[in-house]
A protein has these predicted regions:
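Extracellular beta-rich repeat passengers
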Residues: 214-375, 379, 396
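Right-handed parallel beta-helix
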Residues: 64-198
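Detector for repetitive beta-architecture
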Residues: 30, 41, 53-55, 61-63, ...
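Acidic glycine-/aspartate-rich tracts in secreted/extracellular proteins
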Residues: 37-39, 61-63, 83-86, 258-261, ...
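C-terminal non-catalytic accessory extensions
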Residues: 354-421
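Gram-negative bacterial Sec-dependent N-terminal signal peptides
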Residues: 1-11
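A structural signal for beta-strand register positions
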Residues: 78, 83, 109, 145, ...
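Acidic Gly/Asp/Thr-rich repetitive segments characteristic of extracellular carbohydrate-active
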Residues: 18-56
Length: 421
């Protein structure tokens, strides 16, 4: 345990996570994606541009090759990858930039790969949330597989409030792939002043840094994640001059060393000068484990003895972090694509490696597109059970059939806990 000053928490806990219903609101529309083409009629890009609350379903499965980054800027949207026929939906060749509020993203894979120019590679994330001209809020990213970024696999940009990032795979961020700063490989960045961020039950595998990294000014709950083969950092922090005080609860994360892991890695790395630069920070640590390293670096930073953040009611993490993450994380846990299956197998065997190029691990295996019209229930936006709409109950059943874990929004035979606002 760190040789740190422990003080009492000074504020009431913040609730972390989002209770949004996305596009599943009365008066919404169902939009069918019918082609893997980058653009045009029936494409995902066209669906993103549609106005008004919407649930996007997929009548096609396979790989969408993006000609450029794809951006969602319309609020109240659900991207329901669980509706796609096997092998599901994978985006490649560009980043997904989410710049809208009240959004749910589920059961897709985003694997951009390197671009041809340093200018593009410098911001080649798999998924970016926020970062536009206005703040965004209330976003759930669940059962999404992110890999092969040149910058961050997941970037939660400035001015983002209430995020649930749950049961995802964040893996194999590329190390020497043309980033203008040189060697990279970054898992997840939580930027300054992001509030109420919950990072729960995810697999971080074979990322050199940022598994995740948390900036001063954020309020974040990072718990019950498995971090496998981190290169030089697992969970760590960085200072941003002038930002508001940091609030962080780092709970029950497990770090498993791999072939690329630095011998001195701790589960949580806190800068030794945190107490001087961010004197009002509230950092709570509990139950974090690192094999074979220590849980936390030794230093003069300040901790608190009560968590400054709590999860939304009803989020019940698995009792065994490793088993739960390997069971539930990723786009289609019961029907994994070749990339996720390989990553999970390597983590189980302790052989996962940080890579420079997707070709080192076989790249994407593509077959012909698959087709199956999504059987959306009639009166999809009419009331269903447990305070949900019919379309929500249907999506929950589709997700759990693919291996999604029960959640406040999708209880398994129980009462919905995230009530409609």
């Amino acid at each position: 345990m760190a040789s740190a000053l422990v003080t009492a928490a000074v504020a009431a806990p913040i609730l972390a996570g989002a209770a949004t219903h996305g596009g599943a609101v009365p008066g919404g529309a169902v939009i069918h994606v019918t082609t893997l083409a980058d653009s045009g009629t029936g494409s995902l890009r066209e669906a993103f541009s549609a106005r008004g609350p919407k649930v996007i379903v997929f009548d096609v499965g396979g790989v969408i090759h993006l000609a450029s980054d794809i951006k969602l800027a319309t609020d109240h949207t659900t991207i329901a990858g669980q509706t796609a026929p096997a092998p599901g939906i994978t985006l490649t060749g560009g980043s997904f930039r989410l710049r809208a509020s009240d959004v749910v993203v589920q059961h897709i894979a985003i694997r951009p790969g390197p671009a041809d120019t340093p200018e593009v590679n410098g911001n080649r994330d798999s998924l970016t949330i926020g970062g536009g001209s206005h703040a965004v809020h209330d976003i759930r990213v669940e059962n999404v597989s992110l890999s092969w970024s040149v910058d961050e696999n997941a970037d939660i940009a400035d001015r983002v409030d209430r995020i649930t990032f749950r049961n995802n795979i964040v893996a194999e961020a590329l190390r020497n792939a043309g980033h203008p700063k040189g060697r990279h490989s970054m898992g997840m960045l939580i930027n300054k002043d992001d509030q109420g961020v919950a990072v729960i039950g995810n697999l971080f595998a074979a990322n050199m840094f940022r598994n995740p990294v948390i900036a001063r000014g954020a309020s974040v709950f990072v718990g019950y994640n498995l971090i496998a083969d981190p290169g030089e950092n697992a969970i760590h922090f960085y200072d941003v001059p002038g930002a508001t005080p940091l609030k962080a609860a780092i709970v029950n994360n497990v770090v498993a060393f791999g072939p690329d892991s630095d011998d001195n890695i701790t589960a949580v790395q806190i800068p030794d000068d945190m107490a001087q630069k961010n004197a009002d920070a509230e950092i709570f640590l509990s139950g974090n484990r690192s094999a074979p390293g220590e849980a936390t670096n030794r230093g003069n930073f300040k901790l608190v003895d009560a968590a400054p953040l709590e999860l939304l009611p009803g989020i019940v993490p698995p009792p065994d972090v490793r088993e739960g993450v390997l069971r539930y994380a990723g786009a289609r846990p019961h029907q994994r694509d070749a990339v996720d299956a390989r990553i999970i197998g390597a983590v189980e065997a302790g052989t996962e490696r940080i890579i420079d190029n997707p070709a080192q691990v076989g790249g994407l295996a593509e077959g012909p597109p698959t087709q199956k019209v999504s059987d959306v229930p009639e009166d999809a936006f009419a009331p269903g059970t447990n305070g949900s709409l019919k379309v929500e109950n249907w999506l929950c059943a589709r997700g759990q059939a693919l291996g999604a874990s029960p959640s406040p929004e999708c209880p398994s035979g129980g009462q919905r806990l995230s009530q409609r606002r």
